[in-house]
């Protein structure tokens, strides 16, 4: 089923011209854009550009997600108001998106009058329809800051494995989920105080209402991605299971956001007004351009609406958001497209290794944004698979594909054409069999882009580029140019080469828009669209002098980029330590600790005797098999050879840092005499050792210990 099958073209639109609203998830307004974020914005932008090139009426909408406790606390830390913070961050985000060619039709903010009005309207419609309930709940409360604490703002000791400094909802070591009240020795991340329990009246969206379940079961059947459909069916359960829980949509003051109508001191939870921000940004655009906003969002609208998101927020976009829209009288999304996460060189992005790369640092290092656009596109497909930015492969692929195969075609032909033929192509050569092959491939390449199979589109394009280069190598224009008698053959070769280059540029335009602009200027042609595949270069229009369109990646640029991002961690933490205190020095102490990647929280661990240490049996283990644990976002299941008659089974909370295939064959260190523990996924017969920073927020990353290659399974560590 195609998108046009789901939503036919609106009455009054030109035949075949679709009306499309597309969004990316809203970046949170308390930090910088990094390359992990850019995966999604580049993916969406390529799709939006593809649809524009078809001539469809499409609007790519975005905004900063500005509300919530983290923004409020970040502003307090910086000594500014939340509004001052989000205004500054908006400018930074807009700069970064512009740098990478992300072509929003409107990039707005959720802290707007439009968003407040729309959020209130949707809430009141849901309330009138019987979907809002009020009930008393008990929460953790910080007595020092006098505020209720979200789960992620409480830390303590895991009640299961007793790992320290775990969040209030789940343990990152053993993968157990729990309530904040289950933590041992809990403390507030904000002030360090011990939380107390307080009750408060909260507002809930009744997702458990049978009407919601019935609607969502029908709506899920239209999702394009099988992984998303399967996940939703897992959340919904079988008919009659009633697995959906009501959703808490309110927060207590102090809170930066919109106050709930008729409920003083209560605010909309950020995840209610954030998706409404899609519509608010579009409404702002409609008012400026004279578009009929209601015709796009009303329940009977026949326009199309697509959301590109990360797979980590699928729950919000496939349960809450469509249900909110359905029962408040609005149209629901045509589809939701989720992508995977980004790793760098096979591991989670790391500040200590310099692979936590910000968008601005990439630009500052002098790297071309279109290199990254191309590399990400080459890795992306229509699934939710994670993608890896391998920096050596990045350099090799850009240099080989974009410079060696693509722009090299123009540089080999343009000089001869200008010098020998006044820059004009040979009219009869534009129907060469090679060019027919390229023209015939353009619709398929465009279809790959629309289906979000960017990797396929680029593989096909580079295969065509290989064919063109093969043609040039066989024709040898540099040899033909030596003899005036070969003028006709030379003219034909240069014409075929340059027309082929035009067609390759058309195929690459959604990915390389700035290069495409340069090509259009060089060839003296109007902006390329898919319909231009059959409009060859005119012999009446001379080309202009060739200008370099792309340079090679210099490995020194990559080295400088990594070094800059390593040093930025030190600089940011030092600045925080110097300027950010909360009266008792807790914030400064924490920041100073983050500035030293090797620092550890020594004072939290009392001394033990050598006899105590001798009780721990540390052994070398070889990972002979590894797999993800179904139903867990954090655990990997390891099969370990520890020199015994049979292997051991161990569950480890390291999924965020490693792909299973990366670990197979590695040696590591395990606690061999840890009592076996029965988990819901099976029996864990030990623990592998891993290292992480004391302040994981300032320096994320998890690293298993790897002994010297001379060590063998079963050897004791002593």
UniProtKB/Swiss-Prot annotation:
Which reactions does this protein catalyse? tRNA(Met) + L-methionine + ATP = L-methionyl-tRNA(Met) + AMP + diphosphate
Asked if Plastid is a keyword of the record, the answer is no
Q: What is its EC number?
A: 6.1.1.10
GO CC, alphabetical = cytosol
Name its co-factor(s). Zn(2+)
Q: Which InterPro entries does the entry link to?
A: aa-tRNA-synth_I_CS (IPR001412), Anticodon_Met (IPR041872), Met-tRNA-synth_bsu_C (IPR004495), Met-tRNA_ligase_1 (IPR023458), Met-tRNA_synth (IPR014758), Methionyl/Leucyl_tRNA_Synth (IPR015413), MetRS_core (IPR033911), MetRS_Zn (IPR029038)
Recite the UniProt keywords alphabetically: Aminoacyl-tRNA synthetase, ATP-binding, Cytoplasm, Ligase, Metal-binding, Nucleotide-binding, Protein biosynthesis, RNA-binding, tRNA-binding, Zinc
Give the GO terms filed under biological process for this record: methionyl-tRNA aminoacylation
Task: Determine the domain of life of the protein's source.
Answer: Bacteria
Motif 'KMSKS' region mapped to chain? 348-352
Keyword check for Cytoplasm, yes or no.
yes
Cite the tRNA-binding domain residue spans from the record.
Answer: 612-718
**Gene Ontology MF: a single term:** tRNA binding
Q: Where does Zn(2+) bind?
A: 158, 161, 171, 174
User: Where, if anywhere, are coiled coils annotated?
Assistant: none
Cofactor binding comment, as recorded: Binds 1 zinc ion per subunit.
Cite the PANTHER family for this sequence: METHIONINE--TRNA LIGASE (PTHR45765), METHIONINE--TRNA LIGASE, CYTOPLASMIC (PTHR45765:SF1)
Q: Which family does it belong to?
A: Belongs to the class-I aminoacyl-tRNA synthetase family. MetG type 1 subfamily.
* Name assigned to this protein: Methionine--tRNA ligase
Query: What organism is recorded for this protein?
Result: Burkholderia thailandensis (strain ATCC 700388 / DSM 13276 / CCUG 48851 / CIP 106301 / E264)
């Amino acid at each position: 089923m195609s998108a046009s099958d789901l939503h036919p073209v609106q009455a009054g639109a030109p035949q075949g011209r679709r009306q499309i609203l597309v969004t990316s998830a809203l970046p949170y307004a308390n930090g910088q854009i990094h390359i992990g974020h850019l995966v999604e914005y580049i993916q969406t932008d390529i799709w939006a550009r593809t649809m524009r090139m078809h001539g469809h009426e499409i609007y790519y909408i975005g905004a900063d997600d500005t509300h919530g406790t983290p923004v409020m606390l970040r502003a307090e830390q910086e000594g500014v108001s939340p509004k001052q913070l989000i205004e500054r961050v908006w400018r930074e985000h807009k700069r970064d998106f512009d740098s990478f060619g992300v072509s929003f039709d409107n990039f707005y903010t959720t802290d707007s009058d439009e968003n407040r009005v729309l959020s209130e309207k949707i809430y009141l419609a849901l309330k009138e329809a019987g979907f809002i309930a009020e009930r008393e709940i008990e929460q953790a409360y910080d007595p020092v800051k006098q505020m209720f604490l979200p789960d992620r703002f409480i830390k303590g000791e895991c009640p299961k494995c007793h790992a320290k400094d775990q969040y209030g909802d789940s343990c990152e070591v053993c993968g157990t989920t729990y309530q904040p009240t289950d933590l041992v020795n809990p403390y507030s991340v904000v002030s360090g105080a011990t939380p107390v329990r307080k009750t408060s009246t909260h507002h809930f969206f009744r997702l458990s209402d049978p009407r919601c379940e019935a609607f969502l079961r029908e709506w899920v059947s239209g999702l394009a991605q099988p992984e998303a459909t399967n996940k939703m069916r897992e959340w919904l359960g079988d008919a009659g299971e009633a697995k959906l829980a009501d959703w808490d949509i309110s927060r207590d003051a102090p809170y930066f956001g919109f106050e709930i109508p008729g409920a003083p001191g209560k605010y909309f939870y950020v995840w209610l007004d954030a998706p409404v921000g899609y519509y608010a940004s579009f409404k702002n655009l409609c008012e400026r351009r004279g578009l009929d906003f209601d015709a796009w969002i009303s329940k009977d609208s026949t326009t199309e609406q697509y959301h590109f998101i990360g797979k980590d927020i699928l729950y919000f976009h496939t349960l809450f958001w469509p249900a909110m829209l359905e029962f408040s009288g609005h149209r629901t999304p045509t589809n939701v497209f989720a992508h995977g996460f980004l790793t760098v060189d096979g591991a989670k992005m790391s500040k200590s290794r310099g692979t936590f790369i910000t968008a601005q640092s990439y630009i500052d290092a002098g790297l071309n944004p279109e290199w990254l656009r191309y590399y990400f596109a080459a890795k992306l497909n229509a699934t939710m698979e994670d993608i890896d930015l391998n920096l050596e492969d990045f350099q090799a692929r850009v240099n080989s594909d974009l410079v060696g195969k693509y722009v090299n075609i123009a540089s080999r032909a343009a000089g001869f054409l200008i010098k020998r033929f006044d820059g004009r192509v040979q009219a009869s050569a534009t129907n060469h069999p090679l060019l027919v092959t390229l023209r015939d491939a353009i619709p398929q390449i465009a279809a790959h882009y629309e289906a979000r199979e960017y990797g396929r589109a680029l593989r096909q394009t580079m295969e065509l580029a290989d064919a063109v280069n093969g043609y040039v190598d066989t024709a040898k224009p540099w040899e033909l140019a030596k003899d005036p008698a070969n003028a006709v053959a030379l003219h034909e070769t240069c014409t075929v080469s340059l027309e082929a280059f035009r067609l390759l540029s058309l195929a690459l335009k959604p990915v390389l828009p700035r290069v495409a602009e340069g090509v259009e200027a060089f060839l003296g042609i109007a902006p390329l669209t898919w319909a231009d595949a059959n409009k060859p270069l005119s012999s009446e229009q001379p080309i202009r002098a060739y200008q370099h369109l792309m340079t090679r990646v210099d490995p020194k640029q990559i080295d400088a980029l990594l070094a800059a991002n390593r040093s930025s961690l030190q600089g940011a933490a030092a600045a925080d330590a110097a300027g950010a205190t909360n009266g008792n020095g807790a914030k400064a102490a924490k920041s100073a600790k983050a500035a030293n990647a090797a620092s550890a929280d020594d004072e939290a661990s009392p001394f033990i005797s050598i006899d105590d240490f001798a009780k721990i049996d540390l052994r070398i283990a070889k990972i002979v098999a590894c797999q993800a644990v179904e139903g867990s976002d954090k655990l990997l299941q390891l099969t370990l050879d520890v020199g015994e008659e049979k292997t051991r089974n161990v569950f480890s909370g390291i999924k965020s840092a490693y792909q299973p295939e990366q670990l197979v064959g590695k040696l590591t260190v395990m606690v061999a005499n840890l009592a076996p523990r029965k988990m819901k996924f099976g029996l864990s017969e030990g623990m592998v050792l891993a290292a992480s920073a004391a302040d994981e927020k300032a320096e994320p990353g998890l690293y298993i210990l790897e002994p010297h290659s001379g060590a063998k399974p079963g050897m004791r560590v002593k």
